Regions:
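Short coil turns that delineate tetratricopeptide repeat
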Residues: 14, 48, 82, 115, ...
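TPR alpha-solenoid repeat register
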Residues: 19, 53, 87, 120, ...
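TPR-repeat structural position
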Residues: 33, 67, 100-101, 134
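Register position in tetratricopeptide repeats
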Residues: 29-30, 62-64, 96-98, 130-131, ...
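TPR/TPR-like (Sel1-like) alpha-helical repeat modules
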Residues: 129-153, 159-166
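Canonical tetratricopeptide repeat
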Residues: 22-25, 39, 55-56, 90, ...
């Protein structure tokens, strides 16, 4: 069991960031959100917390349906890593899930600051598919497909693009 191995490894090296992240992820994947939350809190308090720590924190709070705490984690993460495409993407997804359509501002900011991260293009394209402005859905969708053509999301986006082109 990964949790046992990681716990033993952390007994040998208590300050190892990678082991702590792996342990939190193991708890998260096992759906043991209480233990994952304990681990995330200690990760986020570390001075050397990286982007992945904040992503893990957001995912754990999302799983616990604590949107306000989740939002705090993303804001704290973006304060520390203001050019993190993944944090902009996931924060936008949180807002979108709560029907806050200002999420598009986060995705477009993520595209601007971290153009190599595909998730923001995907989310922005999906957002614009639901609006009257189909041009941006096509632009962002095409860029996304060029970045991530073989994934499931890439295949779904290709279908969405085809549908949008047929509407024009």
């Amino acid at each position: 069991n990964a949790v046992i191995v990681l716990t033993r490894a952390l007994q040998q090296d208590k300050k190892n960031l990678e082991l702590q992240k792996d342990l939190v992820m193991s708890y998260y994947l096992k759906r043991d959100y209480t233990k994952a939350l304990e681990g995330v809190k200690s990760l986020l308090d570390r001075d050397d917390a990286d982007v992945i720590c904040f992503q893990l924190g957001g995912n754990v709070y999302k799983a616990l349906e604590e949107a306000k705490e989740c939002e705090k984690v993303y804001k704290k993460g973006l304060k520390k890593f203001p050019k993190s495409g993944p944090l902009f993407s996931e924060y936008g997804e949180l807002l979108w899930a709560t029907k806050d359509y200002s999420a598009i501002n986060l995705w477009e900011k993520g595209i601007q600051l971290d153009p190599g991260y595909s998730g923001n293009y995907y989310n922005a394209a999906v957002y614009y598919f639901y609006t009257k402005d189909k041009v941006w859905s096509l632009v962002y969708g095409e860029i996304f497909v060029n970045m991530e053509s073989l994934s499931q999301r890439g295949l779904a986006m290709k279908q969405q693009l085809l549908k949008a082109y047929k509407e024009k």
